[in-house]
């Protein structure tokens, strides 16, 4: 066995070792080079590092990945899978705005749940899906740590809430009045304000486009890629524009 074969064998063994460590199996089928996969899981980490036992999505990982996707001519579409409890507002909105500004077709799929700042992350794609049993919690913004009891604090909270609400309304079919009503609900969550939406409810209220799974989402992404190849402009619903 020559040096080149040894290097290839070592690289293959290292890859198998990493797969076993990360996924619990030695064989992981590779994703199509045409479609980039982004997973947003656990808690969206902000400027403070979360404890090591907390599953998290780091914006400093997502942003370079999104830039790489945008500049890579081989990638034709982006598939985003979400199962997140929410997290940092600034980091979540930064990732959501990056997803929204990508020129390539994007489709999101909510599995398990996409709560709090996970809501705009789900609606940021051109077209969104939610699995039948998945949930989405809409609630007002909240803060940990020191809070100063002054009118300016309320104004700051209000402005932050407006940023989130405006993004959701801009990227979904939900009316702003409906969104505000769901956020201020007091009889649904224990010791909290807000509303929990399950599968079809999110679609009925215009937050998510369709109930479906992986095959539905990938089929939709393929159709958007084909429309893009035909130079058809897509509107905010991921549908063909009449113009």
Residue ranges and their predicted role:
Residues 1-109, 113-119, 124-139, 143-243:
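N-terminal organellar transit peptides
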């Amino acid at each position: 066995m020559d040096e080149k074969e040894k290097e290839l064998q070592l690289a293959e063994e290292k890859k198998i070792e990493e797969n076993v460590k990360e996924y619990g199996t030695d064989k992981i089928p590779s994703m199509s080079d045409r479609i980039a996969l982004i997973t947003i899981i656990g808690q969206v980490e902000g400027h403070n590092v979360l404890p090591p036992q907390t599953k998290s999505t780091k914006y400093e990982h997502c942003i370079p990945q999104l830039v790489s996707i945008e500049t890579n001519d081989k990638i034709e579409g982006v598939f985003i899978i979400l199962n997140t409890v929410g997290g940092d507002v600034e980091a979540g909105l930064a990732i959501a705005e990056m997803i929204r500004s990508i020129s390539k077709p994007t489709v999101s799929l909510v599995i398990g749940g996409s709560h709090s700042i996970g809501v705009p992350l789900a609606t940021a794609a051109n077209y969104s899906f939610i699995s039948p049993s998945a949930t989405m919690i809409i609630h007002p913004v909240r803060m940990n740590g020191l809070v100063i009891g002054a009118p300016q604090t309320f104004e700051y909270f209000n402005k932050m809430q407006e940023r989130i609400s405006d993004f959701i309304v801009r990227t979904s079919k939900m009316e702003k009045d409906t969104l505000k009503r769901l956020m201020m609900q007091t009889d649904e969550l224990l010791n909290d304000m807000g509303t929990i939406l399950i599968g079809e409810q999110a679609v009925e209220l215009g937050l998510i486009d369709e109930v479906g799974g992986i095959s539905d989402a990938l089929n939709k992404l393929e159709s958007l890629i084909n429309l893009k190849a035909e130079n058809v402009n897509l509107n905010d619903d991921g549908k063909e524009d009449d113009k």
